[in-house]
From Swiss-Prot:
PANTHER family: 3-ISOPROPYLMALATE DEHYDRATASE SMALL SUBUNIT, 3-ISOPROPYLMALATE DEHYDRATASE SMALL SUBUNIT 2-RELATED-RELATED
Protein name (Swiss-Prot/TrEMBL): 3-isopropylmalate dehydratase small subunit
A GO cellular component entry from the record: 3-isopropylmalate dehydratase complex
Enzyme class: lyase
Entry EC number(s): 4.2.1.33
Annotated GO biological process: L-leucine biosynthetic process
HAMAP family reported for this sequence: LeuD_type1
Gene3D superfamilies per record: Aconitase, domain 4
Catalytic activity: (2R,3S)-3-isopropylmalate = (2S)-2-isopropylmalate
């Protein structure tokens, strides 16, 4: 996994609440187990019209949102069924962070396990970011180390994150990588027991 220390990127806004995992990645695209290739199906039912052409009215299809790496949405993002494919699709599309007032618990944890940073900010800060995201050139900087989000215009907001998850993200590790850190101790223990 790629470490997340500081990230500066273009912001796309999706001013909707209760975006569920079936909207993030519809069930018909869940037939694979690899973590890549899901970005093309992200928000599929919103991004494409019934004839398969891109929906020009959907936020992420607008030219000004091309290349966005930070998504700002409203409360209860990632609700619905537990599917790890949802953070896979968001990450594969190119997002490094999702900012919202609240997240569904399982989705939030699935993001952290897949190097996608979910950031909870106050509603008024999210409202400001959604308004700013209407501009084609709006960028944010996220410092995970300092636990702060800021722009070049004076906006700043801090966020909380579990210290254990923070360290894994900073190092670009998942739980398996962490196990390898303790491998010498595991081997020594096994030798002692045999």
């Amino acid at each position: 996994m790629e470490p997340f220390v500081v990230h500066k990127g273009k912001v796309a806004g999706l001013d909707r609440a209760n975006i569920d995992t079936d909207q993030i990645i519809p069930k018909q695209f869940l037939k694979r187990i690899e973590r890549t290739g899901f970005g093309q199906f992200l928000f599929y039912d919103w991004r494409y019209l019934s004839d398969g052409t891109p929906n020009p009215h959907f936020e992420l299809n607008r030219p000004e949102n091309e290349g966005a790496t930070i998504l700002v949405a409203n409360e209860n993002f990632g609700c619905g069924s537990s599917r790890e494919h949802a953070p896979w699709a968001l990450a594969d599309y190119g997002f490094r962070a999702i900012i919202a007032p609240s997240f569904a618990d399982i989705f939030y944890n699935n993001c952290l396990k897949n190097s996608l940073l979910p950031i909870k900010l106050p509603k008024e800060d999210v409202a400001y970011l959604l308004k700013q995201a209407e501009r084609a050139d709006y960028e944010l900087t996220i410092s995970l180390e300092q636990q702060v989000v800021f722009d070049d215009e004076g906006f700043t907001s801090s966020f909380d994150i579990d210290p254990y998850r923070k360290q894994l993200l900073l190092k670009g590790w998942d739980e398996i990588d962490l196990t390898f850190v303790y491998e010498p101790y595991i081997i020594a223990y096994e030798k002692k027991r045999s």
